[in-house]
Amino acid sequence: MDHSLNSLNNFDFLARSFARMHAEGRPVDILAVTGNMDEEHRTWFCARYAWYCQQMMQARELELEH
């Protein structure tokens, strides 16, 4: 995996953006998003996407409680 800071920041930004779309109820086809990635990038990206989805859902639940 290319561990350059710029590359990781770009992938992280994309994972966060797609997680936000998912949290807003917009359809996200994560297989289409990661289709051209090699296995290492896909694994890293999907882990970050899942983490951001979890964070955004927790934030939404907290908002609904108050």
From Swiss-Prot:
Induction of its expression: Expression is dependent on RpoS.
Domain of life: Bacteria
Pfam family, one: GlgS
Signal peptide start and end residues: none
GO BP term, pick one: negative regulation of bacterial-type flagellum-dependent cell motility
SUPFAM superfamilies, per the entry: Glycogen synthesis protein GlgS
Function field: Major determinant of cell surface composition. Negatively regulates motility, adhesion and synthesis of biofilm exopolysaccharides.
HAMAP family the UniProt entry points to: GlgS (MF_00525)
Family: Belongs to the GlgS family.
NCBIfam families per UniProt: PRK02922.1
Protein name per its UniProtKB record: Surface composition regulator
